Amino acid sequence: MNEVGLKDQCFGVEVELTGITREQAAQALADYFGTVPRRDDDYYDSWYVKDEMGKEWRLMSDSSIRGEQKVGARYTSTSDPRYRVEMVTPKLTYAELPKFQECVRRVRTAGGKVNSSCGIHVHVDAANHNRQSLKNLLGIMYSKEDILFKALQVNSYRIANYCQKVREPMLQKARKLSSEETKNLTQLETIWYEGDNGSTEHYN
């Protein structure tokens, strides 16, 4: 397998925000893409917007967000769940990074904002990775995550509940796997999920 460069890496992003409703955020994206937003009456009261490539961007509810709305020139707290917005991108390529950046700008211009309850999640496509590259990635993350967490000012509540650090026992077990033991990802998954494969669980 050829080495995967940054420009070959696909990704997806979840951006949590408030200040505007999901409908307003969807309209901001639709205006940018030249399309029409679509509401889906699902559990998350989602709105969908197709971009110029036909990919769907989702605006969904997230109960962990502390809602705010603009009243006059100021933002004030609100219990209205429509102001709890999570913007979920489709699978994107490196070349689409400027499009993602412009979407963030459009939502911000429409009145979107963040507060301490908001976060951002970046999902990296593992399709071009193998067992060894994932083991290497685990080691790199372990060695750099304290610097990253400090630079991003991740608060202790989020560390405990949503973005736990790599645990050293997990790292040591992964490093000890031989090439024979990692012909498939099953054993590496077992180590990552610390027993049962919880890959279908939300925070894994």
Predicted stretch roles:
Residues M1-V114, A127-N204:
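C-terminal accessory/tail domains of diverse enzymes
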Residues S116-I120, V124:
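Short, conserved phosphate-binding/catalytic loop or strand-edge motifs used
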